[in-house]
Amino acid sequence: PMVMPFGQMDSTLNDNPYLYQASVIDTITYKTVIDAMLDDCSDKHIVLLDLALRNKSDIQRMTYLKEEIAKRHLDASIVAYNAKSPQNFIDILKTDKENVLLLPTNAEAVVNTNIVSIASIIDQKKEAKVSLYGFCEWMTYSTIEVEVFHKLNTQLYSTFALDYKDPY
């Protein structure tokens, strides 16, 4: 048998019993991705956007983020963000350190609506440095405006990486 770890399902996989596709689902890897994000935030102000999430995996992400932020004693603010009235978001941005926005969802419409809203108001506090940390699934979205990703200094985290310094 041959393992095909990445890529789209196609007829080759369906028609050949000796081929199978192995890919790790997000519900298994989200903790690793969130840990990597938070490892990068020790000297930054985390702005965790609480979007009244209803999806089970998004709720798991939010819960894990809150637990880890508390456990690590990180500087963080949790904002009940609403794209229609975003002023409370601007008020909590700090000017003495970088603000890292965490949006714990993979729902394309939710991500797109909220980051477009944030990008449109971020200039109200030009002295605040802002970065958006996101999940690798965001790269597959068809409605995301690339300019918004750049304006928010977006970094996408993934478990699919090689550490060339690790000898094992």
Residue ranges and their predicted role:
Residues 1-68, 133-144:
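Extracytoplasmic ligand/sensor domains, especially the bilobed periplasmic-binding protein
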Residues 25-29, 93-103, 150-161:
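A polyampholytic, Gly/Pro-enriched intrinsically disordered region
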Residues 39-42, 92-98, 124-128:
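Flexible, charged surface loops at secondary-structure boundaries
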Residues 68-96:
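A short, well-structured beta->alpha microelement
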Residues 81-86, 106-108, 136-140, 162-163:
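Glycine-rich beta-alpha junction loops
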Residues 113-168:
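Extracellular/periplasmic periplasmic-binding protein-like sensory domains
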Residues 1-6, 45-51, 79, 96-114, ...:
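Periplasmic-binding protein-like
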Residues 36, 61-64, 89-92, 112-122, ...:
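A short acidic, amphipathic alpha-helical/loop segment
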